[in-house]
Amino acid sequence: MLIPRRVKHRKQHHPKRRGMAKGGTQVAFGEYGIQALTPAYVTNRQIEAARIAMTRHIKRGGKVWINIYPDRPLTKKPAETRMGSGKGSPEWWIANVHPGRVMFELSYPNEKIAREALTRAAHKLPMKCRIVKREAGEA
């Protein structure tokens, strides 16, 4: 599970979910990638589920890159608690993903298997996604 080792502040404000991604919008490491089309909070468990879905489908011979990291805590108050008495305790770690962000990248020799692996991973994520391929002119 991806969580930060230590943080300066245990609790943070909720991040905003508006606007487009400022960086990380193109495939940089692999040949194929999953790009977000809608904004969402992605938890550390969802990132891990997507990674497992990809790696199990490609078995061996491919490489996976994860370009997002859950560095924001989300808090929750216990059930049946009255209002007030402070902010709840941290429950999840999330990555705030904006539209256009390439979250996962994959390098695999067979395009059909690579696309199927990315499709399986996209089903584990809480937003609409599309599969993008590295352009010929990109680094």
Swiss-Prot record:
The keyword rRNA-binding applies. Residues 1-22 are annotated as: Disordered. Pfam families: Ribosomal_L16 (PF00252). Keywords: Ribonucleoprotein, Ribosomal protein, RNA-binding, rRNA-binding, tRNA-binding. Residues 1-20 have a biased composition (Basic residues). GO terms for cellular component: cytosolic large ribosomal subunit. It comes from the Bacteria. One of its GO terms (molecular function) is rRNA binding. GO terms for biological process: translation. PROSITE patterns: RIBOSOMAL_L16_1, RIBOSOMAL_L16_2. InterPro entries: Ribosomal_uL16, Ribosomal_uL16_bact-type, Ribosomal_uL16_CS, Ribosomal_uL16_dom, Ribosomal_uL16_sf. Part of the 50S ribosomal subunit. PANTHER family: 50S/60S RIBOSOMAL PROTEIN L16 (PTHR12220), LARGE RIBOSOMAL SUBUNIT PROTEIN UL16M (PTHR12220:SF13). HAMAP family: Ribosomal_uL16. NCBIfam families: rplP_bact. Binds 23S rRNA and is also seen to make contacts with the A and possibly P site tRNAs. Belongs to the universal ribosomal protein uL16 family. This is Large ribosomal subunit protein uL16. It comes from Streptomyces coelicolor (strain ATCC BAA-471 / A3(2) / M145).
